[in-house]
Amino acid sequence: MGIRSFKPTSPARRYYSVSDFKEITKVEPERSLLEQQTSTGGRNNNGRITSRFRGGGHKQRYRIIDFRRDKIGVPAKVATIEYDPNRTARIALLHYVDGEKRYILAPDGLAVGATLLASRNADIKPGNSLTLRFIPPGTSIHNVEVKKGKGGQLVRSAGVAAQLMAKDGDYAQVRLPSGEIRKVHLDCRATIGQVSNSEHANISLGKAGRSRWLGRRPHNRGVTMNPVDHPMGGGEGRTSGGRHPCSPWGQLSKGLKTRNNKRTDGMIVRRRGTKG
């Protein structure tokens, strides 16, 4: 796993870098685990833009990923390590002894031919899945469930890992990559290890076109718009009109708390960005 850079034959090529994809062992995905995926262009069912600056991009097929890891006690062998256009991490194809095939997020260091297991008796090694109850404190984990049986929702991006800090009663304290420490029930599952493709953060797109390939359209600042389009638009030169920076709908963008989920506030032991 490394990064390729290129001779500066053009201004874009000067800062252009890509993964060397050396860990990839197969080009064509498993057909039985593919689904058609249609692009929304950031529009909802009414055709209105709900997510700005989205659209275009290369056509992709969705790989069905097993985030639940619910084949308990059934060993599986790693058949391939593959590229997934829908996420930053690599994925691994598992062949279970009962004949079933499933994709999982590939942890860092996973090799073809390794045997993985989802069980309370599984070894503490990358790729194995256990409930937090049977994972020792200090272990690096990813693909962490928030609700028992729902499947992993936390810590799934390339190169990230959470750390199991401590256990208290029915809950474990997990330190997330953001620095937040959160309580998660001991019956929730997690996978051992760090997510693969840790060099992803060091890749430079190099040119605007690569953003377009990913379905990202140009992002325009509010201060450059007309007053009809944004509260901070208009004026001769750059001027905010005297108001604080805000979104197109008037919501303050500097320091305003937007989280509105009191039901799970008690699960946050320490918020991200706090010292001590």
Curated annotation (Swiss-Prot):
Q: Which GO terms describe its biological process?
A: cytoplasmic translation
Listed PROSITE patterns: RIBOSOMAL_L2
Where are the compositionally biased (Polar residues) regions? Answer: 34-49
Presence of the UniProt keyword Repeat in the record? no
Renumbered to this chain, region (Disordered) spans 29-54, 212-258
Q: Which Pfam families match?
A: Ribosomal_L2, Ribosomal_L2_C
Key words of the record = Ribonucleoprotein, Ribosomal protein, RNA-binding, rRNA-binding
Q: Does the keyword Hydrolase apply?
A: no
Q: Tell me the function of this protein.
A: One of the primary rRNA binding proteins. Required for association of the 30S and 50S subunits to form the 70S ribosome, for tRNA binding and peptide bond formation. It has been suggested to have peptidyltransferase activity; this is somewhat controversial. Makes several contacts with the 16S rRNA in the 70S ribosome.
How the protein assembles, per its UniProt entry?
Answer: Part of the 50S ribosomal subunit. Forms a bridge to the 30S subunit in the 70S ribosome.
Q: What is this protein called?
A: Large ribosomal subunit protein uL2
User: What gene does this protein come from?
Assistant: rplB
